[in-house]
């Protein structure tokens, strides 16, 4: 009797498996249930919400850095998206970056980006921005410093090897000189290029024009020639992204020699 019961169970198992293969049987209880959710429209914003806990931790760490390096740290702030920014004196580039890289509570060992911002209305028009990443604590920090056209900034290659090409790009595009750089030369523009294209006062047309001369069978460089006479364009726009960096427009003044040009 026991052997017959086992045989019947074995035969029912085969029939059940074949029925499932044909799609005519019921699913087995061992199958995991599929979770289905409604595909309703999500109207929530896609921005990252504010995290008060992370905001407090970043603020505390920023204050800690300011206490350790009071000679160099000038300002510490946390943005609304939990991004820590440390503004330092130009002389503190190497000490601050070394501290953030080697300290046990920091471990910012990756330089993910190094760039510059040109604000001509400031006395120190160039803002140098270092973006660091800590894989140990899954955290980021932004270090900012400043300089002008003539004052050099200490190169960060001795702290982060990745700063080599970043600093070459800043020198090429903005003209910021990095002292003690192992190979500070242009990296994007051609040899003999004049000026620095990312400066706000760099003309859109450039200073020279490169074209192929069919007579000499090579590329020649010539000064830019405008096809029309110079006009003064209105640089103030209602869609200006950074209006606070613009100087207020000067009111037009009527000189004595221009009175005859006014319509009667």
Curated annotation (Swiss-Prot):
Main location: mitochondrion
InterPro entries the record matches: NADH_DH_suC, NADH_quin_OxRdtase_su_C/D-like, NADH_UbQ_OxRdtase_30kDa_su, NADH_UbQ_OxRdtase_CS
A single BP term in Gene Ontology: mitochondrial respiratory chain complex I assembly
Keywords: Electron transport, Membrane, Mitochondrion, Mitochondrion inner membrane, NAD, Oxidoreductase, Respiratory chain, Transit peptide, Translocase, Transport, Ubiquinone
Group of enzyme by EC: translocase
Molecular function GO terms recorded: NADH dehydrogenase (ubiquinone) activity; NADH dehydrogenase activity
Subcellular location: Mitochondrion inner membrane
PROSITE patterns in UniProt: COMPLEX1_30K
Stated name of the protein: NADH dehydrogenase [ubiquinone] iron-sulfur protein 3, mitochondrial
Source organism per UniProt: Pan troglodytes (Chimpanzee)
Source species taxonomy: Eukaryota, Metazoa, Chordata, Craniata, Vertebrata
Primary gene name: NDUFS3
């Amino acid at each position: 009797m026991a052997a017959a019961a086992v045989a019947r169970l074995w035969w029912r198992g085969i029939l059940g498996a074949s029925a499932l293969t044909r799609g005519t049987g019921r699913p087995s209880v061992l199958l995991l249930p599929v979770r289905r959710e409604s595909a309703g429209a999500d109207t929530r914003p896609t921005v990252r919400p504010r995290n008060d806990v992370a905001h407090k931790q970043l603020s505390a760490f920023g204050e800690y850095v300011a206490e350790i390096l009071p000679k160099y740290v000038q300002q510490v702030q946390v943005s609304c998206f939990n991004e820590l920014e440390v503004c330092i004196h130009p002389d503190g580039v190497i000490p601050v970056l070394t501290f953030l890289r080697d300290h046990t509570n920091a471990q910012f060992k990756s330089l993910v980006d190094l760039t510059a911002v040109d604000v001509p209305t400031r006395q120190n028009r160039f803002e140098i921005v270092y973006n660091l990443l800590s894989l140990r604590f899954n955290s980021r920090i932004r270090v900012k410093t400043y300089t002008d056209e003539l004052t050099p900034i200490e190169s960060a290659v001795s702290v982060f090897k990745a700063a080599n090409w970043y600093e070459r790009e800043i020198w090429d595009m903005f003209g910021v000189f990095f002292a003690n750089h192992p190979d500070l030369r242009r990296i994007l523009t051609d040899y003999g290029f004049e000026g620095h294209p990312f400066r706000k006062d760099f003309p859109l047309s450039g200073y020279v024009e490169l074209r192929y001369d069919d007579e000499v069978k090579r590329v020649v460089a010539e000064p830019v020639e405008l096809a029309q006479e110079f006009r003064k364009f209105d640089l103030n726009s209602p869609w200006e992204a950074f209006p606070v960096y613009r100087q207020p427009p000067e009111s037009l003044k009527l000189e004595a020699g221009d009175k005859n040009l006014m319509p009667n």
